[in-house]
UniProtKB/Swiss-Prot annotation:
Acidic residues bias: start-end ranges: 203-212
Subcellular location as annotated: Nucleus, Nucleolus
Record protein name field: U3 small nucleolar RNA-associated protein 18 homolog
InterPro entries attached to this UniProt entry: Utp18 (IPR045161), WD40/YVTN_repeat-like_dom_sf (IPR015943), WD40_repeat_dom_sf (IPR036322), WD40_rpt (IPR001680)
Residues annotated with Phosphoserine modification: 114-115, 118, 201-202, 206
Similarity comment: family membership: Belongs to the WD repeat UTP18 family.
Basic and acidic residues: compositionally biased ranges: 72-81
Species in which this protein is naturally found: Mus musculus
Subunit relationships: Part of the small subunit (SSU) processome, composed of more than 70 proteins and the RNA chaperone small nucleolar RNA (snoRNA) U3.
WD repeats: 245-284, 289-329, 376-415, 417-458, 467-508, 515-551
Major localization listed first in the record, in broad terms: nucleus
GO BP: ribosomal small subunit biogenesis; rRNA processing
Keyword Chaperone: no
């Protein structure tokens, strides 16, 4: 170090230039003693009795003075070069130590303060949690006291204590119901007591998850693709034929395969088309067939034609929807039937199957309406249906036997007796090629697997539906093969919707104690399952919206 800087440093230290340090008159022990003696010779001023705070401050000041004295003594023993180097590297040691002590004291105080605040906060939370939660808002109508008539309800009569309680307010009725519940349960159960359970770590985690759920407004759970069993969510829509009311029996109800249109026909000789919107269902047009009470009407597979038959005629009417022409087919070459009533259209639109008398089934070309071939069973035909791929025909006889035919060869592939059936009435095949349902006169519906019907001579049904007590005259699978509709025209309200594959009946249809369906004659589902329609003997085509299916 240069001599000038060294001498300047020593001079500044001794002159008291360093802040926060008392000036020293010189080096060595003699000046220090002189300084102390000079302090003793100063006259003492009269002071009041020291308080606890002033005593603590005086003790700290004395401690600081002793540290300074020891530090100065040590610094005097160090070489000047070492003292200068420490000052350059560490700064003023005295200031740094004082600042460090001050920071330590302040941090300790903040730590105690924060702990105290946290304890106060926890106590406040405990007190707040014990308080009863108040409602977010209060409805003025709820505050008005409403009187409940106790005598008009048999359940409320049981909780009346005397005749004077024929009318009670809502609050008193609520208290009375609570008392009855507690009496039946033997006290208040744990789940009914607010705050009775202590929160565990799992409860805290679930609460955190709930908080996370409340941070978003999107959908967390997507709609299930499969239809749940038990309750079928549905809405009663305006009748399909509301704009053309009639009192004649409805014989056929069918949805158009490609357009949002429903067809309604009946014994009043009319075929009507309606636009399906679920609200007004406006009429598109009506076709009147003179002296032709319609037994059955059906769309072609492509939806371009409507076929209709009557109860006492061998004429088959074909209505061309594109051209707007009505074409009667008076005679089919090779067909010797006196009447043409029951018929089926193949799903691929290639064939037309007509059920005749004496057990004959006649297969016609849908395009030319010419006879291709005939098939015969033992006994009379009760009902027939095509498989979903149009390669097989299922014929159900009145004797309870089921015949499986190959369409191309028109040969019988298999034949079996419907289990427990003495007289067959209806048959239907599912759209996915999995099930065959047979409805008998006893009201039993047997559901079979189609593979077992082809391979076994005595197949066992998957499930026997026994919810009806009269003959099952109508069967219909929905497009997704999740619902099987069964109905009987022999009894009012005799309709059930069966869930598949559980084979359980939906409990909410039909609505209990509401005679709105009457005697159901025909049923159908819309192409994608969004609507369900049925016609009754009173001339009403009732329609329901199935909420599980978003499309028509």
């Amino acid at each position: 170090m240069p001599p000038e800087r060294k001498s300047r440093t020593r001079r500044d230290r001794r002159a008291g230039a360093t802040p926060g340090r008392k000036a020293r008159p010189g080096s060595g022990s003699t000046p220090a003693k002189a300084a102390r003696s000079s302090q003793r010779t100063q006259p003492a001023e009269p002071r009041a009795a020291p308080s606890a705070g002033s005593a603590a401050a005086a003790a700290e000041e004395e401690e600081s003075r002793l540290r300074q004295r020891n530090r100065l003594t040590l610094e005097d023993d160090k070489p000047a070069a070492e003292r200068c180097l420490e000052q350059l590297v560490f700064g003023d040691v005295e200031d740094d130590e004082d600042a460090l002590l001050q920071r330590l004291r302040s941090s300790r105080g903040q730590l105690h303060g924060s702990s105290d605040e946290s304890e106060v906060e926890n106590e406040a939370k405990d007190i707040f949690s014990q308080k009863k939660k108040q409602p977010v808002w209060v409805d003025e109508d709820d505050e008005d006291e409403e009187i409940v008539d106790m005598s008009n309800n048999r359940f409320r009569k049981d909780i009346m204590k005397n005749a004077s309680e024929s009318k009670l307010s809502k609050d008193k009725l609520q208290k009375r119901l609570k008392e009855e519940f507690q009496h039946a349960m033997g006290g208040v159960p744990d789940w009914a007591e607010a705050g009775s359970k202590r929160r565990t770590s799992s409860d805290d985690e679930s609460e955190e998850d709930e908080d996370d759920l409340l941070q978003r407004t999107g959908n967390f759970i997507s709609t299930s693709t499969s239809l749940p069993r038990g309750i079928l969510k549905m809405k009663n829509c305006r009748p399909a034929n509301a704009e053309r009311p009639t009192t004649a029996r409805i014989s056929s109800v069918q949805f158009h395969p490609g357009a949002q249109v429903v067809m309604v026909s009946g014994v009043d000789n009319a075929i009507s088309l309606f636009q399906v919107d679920g609200k007004t269902n406006p009429k598109i047009q009506s076709i009147y067939l003179e002296k032709f009470p319609i037994f059955k009407a059906c769309f072609s597979a492509n939806g371009e034609e409507v076929l209709a038959t009557s109860m006492h005629s061998k004429v088959l009417y074909v209505y061309d929807m594109l051209a707007g022409k009505l074409i009667p087919v008076h005679q089919v070459r090779g067909l010797k039937e006196k009447t043409v009533k029951q018929f089926e259209v193949s799903p691929d639109g290639s064939f037309l199957l007509i059920s005749g008398i004496a057990g004959f089934s006649h297969l016609l070309s849908m395009k030319t309406k010419e006879l291709i071939g005939s098939m015969k069973i033992n006994g009379r035909i009760a009902a027939s249906t095509f498989s979903s791929d149009s390669k097989r025909i299922y014929t159900y006889s009145e004797n309870g036997e089921v015949y499986v035919w190959d369409v191309n060869s028109r040969k019988c592939m298999n034949r079996f007796l419907d289990e427990g059936s003495l007289c067959g009435l209806s048959i239907a095949a599912s759209k996915n090629g999995q099930y065959v349902a047979c409805g008998s006169k006893s009201g039993v519906v047997n559901i079979y697997n189609q593979d077992s019907c082809l391979q076994q001579t005595n197949p066992k049904p998957i499930k026997a539906i026994m919810n009806l007590v009269t003959g099952v005259t109508s069967l219909a699978f929905n497009p997704t093969t999740e619902i099987l509709a069964v109905a009987s025209r022999k009894m009012k309200e005799a309709v059930r919707l069966v869930h598949l594959p559980s084979c359980t009946v939906f409990s909410n249809f039909p609505v209990f104690k509401k005679s709105t369906l009457s005697r159901v004659q025909t049923m159908d589902f819309s192409p994608r399952g969004g609507y369900f329609a049925l016609g009754n003997e009173k001339g009403r085509a009732l329609m329901y919206r199935l909420h599980h299916y978003s499309d028509f």
